[in-house]
């Protein structure tokens, strides 16, 4: 009797790694998760030890097998999804990283980004990569490592060093150094990849003095890249056949295959992506243009809005302010609030993302009175997530000319019913919460399974991740717009506060 076959998704995130095994119905059969340490060398810097990431991945692969009694020989293919932009540079011969991985959130390379802007490269980089110049992306992180590790530039020029985002690093490790590749979606987040020509861009590489030999080969999101070395996959030589950055994997897992479909993942941050089809649309309002996925020889472009603080605002209530003991408790407290929504929290702890891109802004609170309670404060913090999403959705509609009718949602904070209802109200559209909230891992599994024929085609996937719950807008138009105007005033005041500080510094 033949054994049942499965797909394994490796979901390598910002704070933890997970391995999830899916069956042919797209159901989770087994999973394992392991956190790893965050490294904060200085204020605003965030780093990871790339070997600790690899160790955590090895651990969760084993954990998923142990929990389910599934054998490595039963895994038909592996899909990888990952925290994007996070940058690793390692020795080609030994496989040892020459510096910690610099994480997407880290601001240590902001001076390099600022210099690129001052030198007048904003338009050129935007037109080629679809991105704004920011420390968020990989390019300045590579430059920083080559500048700060003695001898690194020279070694890179000799072809002794390799660069990769986390997908590349994991494939390199799983194949024991046999394969150095990335995929369209991750390459599109480096600020080095020309998303129109689908090539590493020589002009940008020259500008940043980054040797092309360091860079991985760019592949589609669904094809066989290589096989695991048996000793790295508990005896199994299994095809690695799907890869996508976490937010693009979620777009695919949400089955947002048609132009105009939009998904939002409420994680640490909140990332809203709209499928714009086979045409690259440049934003004139600070959205990012990126590659959603490339499959069967066809690239699908996307517009993306990045919100830096979403779920982490709830963690701040729990860990920083000690207002709640668990994240789910925020919903009960918010529902108990009797305020008239006059309190606004602007959680700009690491600046503001789309559409403001103001890295100097810092968190602020407005509208407090003597009667403001803990419940009111918690509700305002949850509402801040929804207001930020409205900022992005409004911008997307202007840029794309598409009237968005529905937002597909997933991620941890999407479980908060109060937040989802307020999100529907403040947007005035339907919110469709996925039945299977593991959409990021599911997207990676779908991409891997398609490449090896585990699922026949994209139509076969459409039954596998239905809507779990629909939230419909119920707030009247005048109240909705009054609340949103208050939010816009709060954001403006937040920006003015730090601008005044910058002006004071300049005057000294």
From Swiss-Prot:
It catalyses: glycerol + ATP = sn-glycerol 3-phosphate + ADP + H(+). Glycerol binds at residues 84-85, 136, 246-247. Its EC number is 2.7.1.30. It comes from the Bacteria. GO terms for biological process: glycerol catabolic process; glycerol metabolic process; glycerol-3-phosphate metabolic process. ADP binds at residues 14, 18, 268, 311, 412, 416. Key enzyme in the regulation of glycerol uptake and metabolism. Catalyzes the phosphorylation of glycerol to yield sn-glycerol 3-phosphate. This is Glycerol kinase. It comes from Streptococcus pyogenes serotype M28 (strain MGAS6180). The lineage of its organism: Bacteria, Bacillati, Bacillota, Bacilli, Lactobacillales.
């Amino acid at each position: 009797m033949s054994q049942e076959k499965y797909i394994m998704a490796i979901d390598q995130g910002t704070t933890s790694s997970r391995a999830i095994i899916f069956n042919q119905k797209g159901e989770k059969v087994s999973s394992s998760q392991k956190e790893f340490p965050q490294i904060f060398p200085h204020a605003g810097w965030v780093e990871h030890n790339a070997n600790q990431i690899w160790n955590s991945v090895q651990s969760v692969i084993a954990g998923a097998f142990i929990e389910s009694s599934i054998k490595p020989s039963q895994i038909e293919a592996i899909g990888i999804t990952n925290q994007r932009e996070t940058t690793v540079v390692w020795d080609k011969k030994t496989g040892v990283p020459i510096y910690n991985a610099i994480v997407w959130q880290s601001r240590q390379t902001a001076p390099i980004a600022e210099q690129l802007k001052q030198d007048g490269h904003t338009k050129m980089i935007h037109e080629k990569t679809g991105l704004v110049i920011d420390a968020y992306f990989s390019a300045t992180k590579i430059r920083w490592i080559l500048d700060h590790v003695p001898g690194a530039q020279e070694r890179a020029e000799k072809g002794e060093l390799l660069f990769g985002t986390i997908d590349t690093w994991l494939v390199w490790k799983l194949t024991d150094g046999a394969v150095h590749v990335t995929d369209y979606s991750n390459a599109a987040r480096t600020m080095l990849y020309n998303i129109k020509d689908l090539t590493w861009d020589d002009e940008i590489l020259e500008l940043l003095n980054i040797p092309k030999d360091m860079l991985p080969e760019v592949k589609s999101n669904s094809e066989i890249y290589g096989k695991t070395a048996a000793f790295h996959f508990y005896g199994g030589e299994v095809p690695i056949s799907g890869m996508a950055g976490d937010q693009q994997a979620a777009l695919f897992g949400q089955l947002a295959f048609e132009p105009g479909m939009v998904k939002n993942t409420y994680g640490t941050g909140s990332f809203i992506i709209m499928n714009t089809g086979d045409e690259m649309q440049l934003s004139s309002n600070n959205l990012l243009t990126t590659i959603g996925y490339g499959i069967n020889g066809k690239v699908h472009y996307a517009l993306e809005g990045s919100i830096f603080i979403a779920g982490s605002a709830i963690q701040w209530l729990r860990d920083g302010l000690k207002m709640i003991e668990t994240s789910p408790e925020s919903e009960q407290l918010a529902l108990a609030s009797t305020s008239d929504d006059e309190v606004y929290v602007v959680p700009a702890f690491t600046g503001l993302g789309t559409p403001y891109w103001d890295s100097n802004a810092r968190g602020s609170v407005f509208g407090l009175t003597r009667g403001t309670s803990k419940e009111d404060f918690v509700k305002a913090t949850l509402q801040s997530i929804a207001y930020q999403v409205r900022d992005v959705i409004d911008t997307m509609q202007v840029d794309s000319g598409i009237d968005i009718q529905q937002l597909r949602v997933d991620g941890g904070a999407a479980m908060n019913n109060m937040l989802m209802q307020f999100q529907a109200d403040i947007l005035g559209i339907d919110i469709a919460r996925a039945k299977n909230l593991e959409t990021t891992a599911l997207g990676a599994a779908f991409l891997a399974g398609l490449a090896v024929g585990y699922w026949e085609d994209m139509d076969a996937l459409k039954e596998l991740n239905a809507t779990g719950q629909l939230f419909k807008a119920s707030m009247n138009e005048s109240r909705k717009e009054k609340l949103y105007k208050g939010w816009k005033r709060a954001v403006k005041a937040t920006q003015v506060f730090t601008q005044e500080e910058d002006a004071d510094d300049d005057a000294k």
